[in-house]
């Protein structure tokens, strides 16, 4: 391969083959692992060409996300075996998918029949759901980022625009391809994350069934207008069930948009659902600790020390032993159909209570040993209280309580998100106005007179956010940023008392 010599030291465990594709800052080459003789794809990112800070940040973010999945097994997320970073390049060694991407497949087939589209869509939703469960939102879902293996199973790839979700915080960056981007993304609004992936999945489902995207226009302002207005046409040949599902995924208001959990329960999705997709994947930490004995024996046969392999796997290390182990493990499952050899799951409406849904058996993480369980619907309401009062009236009461407790605050964007600071024993400020910021940007509210004994031992910084729920109520949430946990709980109790909740 051209340029193979310059990578020889970093990729000494691989025979390098031909170039599969070339991008602006990266190229993908096919390679063979020397010890296991299994094929891999290696993405080579040239760090010298990524001079723009945002491109370097994109690469770092992708590496961070990929390393989250490096020892996790999901049948429809591209497998990453190792990430090698050198001063000049970043090498991402990953699963090789020989049938290209979903876009080329759609263009070749023009459009898919409903059964084939459903099979593909079920796999996509399973992968996206797994990302969300591990606090990763993809943000760039499109057919080009969905690869196909030798049996045309979907593999979710390219996490370069992904981000890690944090409780109580929104994302704002406008990411992804315009045709697949949600209205709130192109409008520059705040979003939590999962809801924009749901929109993109709706566009992908439309493309699978229709051979075109629902929102398209050569004129960018017109395209934005169509997306923001949710203006599209559903062909008459689509069944009523899939028309219903698409229309619920492409709702402009993210609060009313269907969720991944609701998609899973939809009748169209449930039809001919493979059993391995009806089974929730193993917990991340439990899965990382599981060792396949047959694969372990094969790794030892290659000359690796058994104890060192086990120790590396348990500690989630990246080294020659773990790379060989996961390559052998994945190819074992492909050879035996592994996950993908399961039978169909009965639709929920026709299934008996004992077969409605499953959890992995305690001795089998791949779903062959299943035990039935009853899914109990639970509604969680995080935050202090729900109210139907106008949001402005709620915030006035909140500010009154903050004033009573002598909390410093400032608006964080709009008036429904406040950054706050509370110092126990801080002298009362009598001229605080309810409709203005009690700013602490320049720390003028707290003066240091040089006396160490006068400095307060603890300061609580927290955020207050008012949310609107699906049933048109308003939910007040508080999140500690810094400061002692118990002291924050004491403050919350005092705050609730002032709000007359307790």
Swiss-Prot record:
Pfam families, from UniProt? Answer: KA1 (PF02149), Pkinase (PF00069), UBA (PF00627)
Q: Which InterPro entries match?
A: KA1/Ssp2_C, KA1_dom, Kinase-like_dom_sf, Prot_kinase_dom, Protein_kinase_ATP_BS, Ser/Thr_kinase_AS, UBA
Protein kinase domain ranges (all copies): 14-269
EC code(s) of this entry: 2.7.11.1
Q: Which residues carry this modification: Phosphothreonine?
A: 173
Specify whether Electron transport is a keyword of the entry: no
What's an example Gene Ontology biological process for this entry? intracellular signal transduction
Record GO terms (molecular function) = ATP binding; protein serine kinase activity; protein serine/threonine kinase activity
Give a Gene Ontology cellular component term annotated to this protein.
cytoplasm
Q: Which residues constitute the catalytic centre?
A: 140
Q: Which reaction does it catalyse?
A: L-seryl-[protein] + ATP = O-phospho-L-seryl-[protein] + ADP + H(+); L-threonyl-[protein] + ATP = O-phospho-L-threonyl-[protein] + ADP + H(+)
Domain UBA, residue spans? 290-330
Keywords attached to this Swiss-Prot or TrEMBL record, sorted alphabetically, are: ATP-binding, Carbohydrate metabolism, Kinase, Nucleotide-binding, Phosphoprotein, Serine/threonine-protein kinase, Transferase
Q: Where is the KA1 domain?
A: 453-501
Residues that, per the record, bind ATP: 20-28, 43
**Cystines in this chain:** none
User: What family name appears in the similarity comment?
Assistant: Belongs to the protein kinase superfamily. CAMK Ser/Thr protein kinase family. SNF1 subfamily.
- Function as written in the Swiss-Prot or TrEMBL entry: Essential for release from glucose repression.
Task: Write down what this protein is called.
Answer: Carbon catabolite-derepressing protein kinase
The record lists the organism as Secale cereale
């Amino acid at each position: 391969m051209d340029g193979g010599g310059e990578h020889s030291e970093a990729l000494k465990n691989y025979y390098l083959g031909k170039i599969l594709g070339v991008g602006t800052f990266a190229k993908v080459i096919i390679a063979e692992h020397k010890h296991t003789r299994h094929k891999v794809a290696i993405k080579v990112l040239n760090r010298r060409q990524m001079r723009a800070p945002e491109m370097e940040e994109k690469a770092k973010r992708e590496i961070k996300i990929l390393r989250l999945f490096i020892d996790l097994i999901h049948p429809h997320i591209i497998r990453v075996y190792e990430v090698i970073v050198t001063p000049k390049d970043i090498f991402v060694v990953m699963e090789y998918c020989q049938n290209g991407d979903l876009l080329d497949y759609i263009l070749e087939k023009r459009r898919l029949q409903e059964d084939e589209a459903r099979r593909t869509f079920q796999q996509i939703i399973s992968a996206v759901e797994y990302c969300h469960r591990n606090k990763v939102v993809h943000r760039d879902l499109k057919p080009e980022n969905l690869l196909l293996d030798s049996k045309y199973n979907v593999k979710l790839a390219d996490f370069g625009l992904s981000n890690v979700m944090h409780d109580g915080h929104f994302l704002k960056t406008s990411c992804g391809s315009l045709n697949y981007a949600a209205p709130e993304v192109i409008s520059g609004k705040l979003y939590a994350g999962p809801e924009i992936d749901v929109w993109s999945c709706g566009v992908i489902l439309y493309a699978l069934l229709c051979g075109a995207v629902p929102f398209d226009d050569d004129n960018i302002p017109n395209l934005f207008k169509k997306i923001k207005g949710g203006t599209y046409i559903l062909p008459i040949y689509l069944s009523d069930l899939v028309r219903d599902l698409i229309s619920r995924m492409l709702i402009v208001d993210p609060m009313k948009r269907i969720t991944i959990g609701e998609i899973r329960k939809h009748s169209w999705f449930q039809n001919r659902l493979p059993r391995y997709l009806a089974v929730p994947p193993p917990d991340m930490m439990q899965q990382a600790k599981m060792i396949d004995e047959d694969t372990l024996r094969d790794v030892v046969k290659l000359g690796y020390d058994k104890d060192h392999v086990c120790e590396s796997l348990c500690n989630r290390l990246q080294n020659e032993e773990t790379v060989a182990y996961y390559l052998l493990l994945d190819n074992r499952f492909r050879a035996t159909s592994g996950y993908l050899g399961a039978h169909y799951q009965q639709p929920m409406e026709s299934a008996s209570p004992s077969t409605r849904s499953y959890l992995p058996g305690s001795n089998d993480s791949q779903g062959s040993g299943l035990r039935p369980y009853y899914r109990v619907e639970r509604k969680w309401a995080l935050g202090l209280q729900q109210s139907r009062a106008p949001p402005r009236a709620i915030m006035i009461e909140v500010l009154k309580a903050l004033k009573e407790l002598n909390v410093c605050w400032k608006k964080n964007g709009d008036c429904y998100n406040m950054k706050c600071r509370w110092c126990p024993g801080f002298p009362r400020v009598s001229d605080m106005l309810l409709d203005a910021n009690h700013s602490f940007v320049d720390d003028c509210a707290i003066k240091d007179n040089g006396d160490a004994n006068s400095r307060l031992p603890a300061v609580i910084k927290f955020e207050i956010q008012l949310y609107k729920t699906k049933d048109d109520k308003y939910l007040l949430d508080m999140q500690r940023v810094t400061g002692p946990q118990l002291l924050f709980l004491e403050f919350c109790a005092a705050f609730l008392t002032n709000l007359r909740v307790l």
